[in-house]
Amino acid sequence: MIRELEYYGSHILRRKADIIPEITDATRQLVQDMYETMVAHKGVGLAAPQVGESLSLFVMCVEGETEEGDLIFCDFPKVYINPVLSNPSEDLVIGREGCLSIPGLRADVYRPQSITVTAVNLDGQEFTEHLEGFPARIIMHENDHLHGVLYIDKMEEPKDIKKFKASLEKIRRRYHAHVKPEDRAS
């Protein structure tokens, strides 16, 4: 089922997500729904808070990059439950980021070139993988959602931040009707 997205202005996007104590049928259904929602909105990753669930879970549908820099997409998303990031590379690279919860806007963000993630999959098995380039950027972006952080919080250019203020307010107003009453920004 395609779920309704949470947009800038929703408090759930600013909360620390809850750890998932066990994988249930509801968890599996949430992953399926997140995958369908991500595909419907042409995303490459999606975190549970973006579909209104304050749970430590995200999905990603990029396996890697070719030597030419083209993305290699997967048939079903990789699932990261209760992820923990470690070993960020010291070298930072700038990359353009967008977010399904902040439609129509993109900005340059500095992030480590590589990262290690340890998480649990849908079978309850812990795994660790090391990612580089764009897949690493997706992991860091989605993991930020689990800590109430949006990519706009990482923007460094004052001119970009100033430029975004009016656009963010328009997004907040436009999608405010979709925000649950308890999650309305003041």
Swiss-Prot record:
Primary enzyme class: hydrolase
Residues annotated for Fe cation binding in this entry: C99, H141, H145
GO biological process, one term: translation
SUPFAM superfamilies: Peptide deformylase
Manner of cofactor binding, per the entry note: Binds 1 Fe(2+) ion.
One Pfam match: Pep_deformylase
InterPro entries the UniProt entry points to: Peptide_deformylase, Peptide_deformylase_sf
EC number(s) stated in the UniProt entry for this protein: 3.5.1.88
Signal peptide: none
Reaction(s) the record says it catalyses: N-terminal N-formyl-L-methionyl-[peptide] + H2O = N-terminal L-methionyl-[peptide] + formate
Residues the record marks as active site: E142
Molecular-function annotations in GO: metal ion binding; peptide deformylase activity
Listed name of the protein: Peptide deformylase
Annotated source species: Chlamydia caviae (strain ATCC VR-813 / DSM 19441 / 03DC25 / GPIC) (Chlamydophila caviae)
